[in-house]
């Protein structure tokens, strides 16, 4: 199953029962990774991109328009230029290339790095996350607590193909 918040209850139970430092889950083709803290709390993609930005210190970061507005304020705090993009892989990658960005991310936990030629690579993201944990020696919840979790839900609305553009306008 997809590594969504709803599908991770077993992993959350294991993290709590075994007192794990954190948990991870990949999607089927390993281009997406989700993280859970030591309490089994799900970290959204914006929280993970916040951590990657804070500790890896990229100069330019591309993020989706669906990120909470506070995200751009943190980028300024970390002296990173934030570039907002349309939602979706193609838009993020194109925006990263056009702006020579170092890192990009989606709420859905797809992350992109210039170092990997903009490929979605969950394993590269995982190793960057491990590097952050090793260098900071703090619990994941401690590292993430500075970034406030604002209520945000996404939902799908079914519309006929011929009506989508009219509705968006």
Describe every region a protein language model picked out.
Residues 5-12, 46-50, 168:
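Short, well-ordered alpha-helical scaffold segments within catalytic/effector domains
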Residues 2-6, 41-44, 121:
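Alpha-helix N-cap and loop-to-helix initiation/capping positions
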Residues 31-49, 71-72:
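Short Gly/Thr/Asp-enriched flexible loops that form oxyanion-binding sites at enzyme active sites
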Residues 41-60, 86-87:
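Short, acidic/small-residue loops that bind anionic groups at enzyme active sites
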Residues 7-15, 53, 92, 96:
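Generic hydrophobic alpha-helical segments
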Residues 26-32, 38, 65, 107, ...:
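Generic detector of well-ordered alpha-helical packing
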């Amino acid at each position: 199953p997809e590594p969504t918040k709803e599908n991770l209850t077993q992993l959350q139970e294991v993290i709590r029962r075994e007192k794990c430092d954190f948990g991870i889950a990949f999607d089927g083709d390993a281009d997406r990774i989700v993280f859970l803290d030591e309490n089994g709390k799900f970290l959204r993609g914006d929280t993970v991109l916040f951590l990657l930005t804070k500790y890896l210190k990229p100069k330019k970061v591309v993020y989706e328009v669906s990120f909470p507005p506070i995200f751009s304020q943190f980028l300024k705090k970390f002296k990173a230029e934030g570039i907002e993009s349309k939602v979706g892989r193609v838009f993020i990658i194109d925006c990263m290339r056009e702006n020579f960005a170092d890192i990009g991310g989606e709420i859905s936990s797809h992350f992109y790095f210039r170092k990997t030629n903009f490929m979605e690579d969950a394993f590269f993201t995982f190793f960057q996350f491990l590097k952050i944990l090793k260098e900071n020696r703090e619990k994941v919840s401690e590292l993430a607590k500075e970034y406030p979790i604002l209520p945000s839900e996404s939902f799908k609305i079914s519309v006929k193909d011929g009506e989508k553009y009219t509705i968006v306008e």
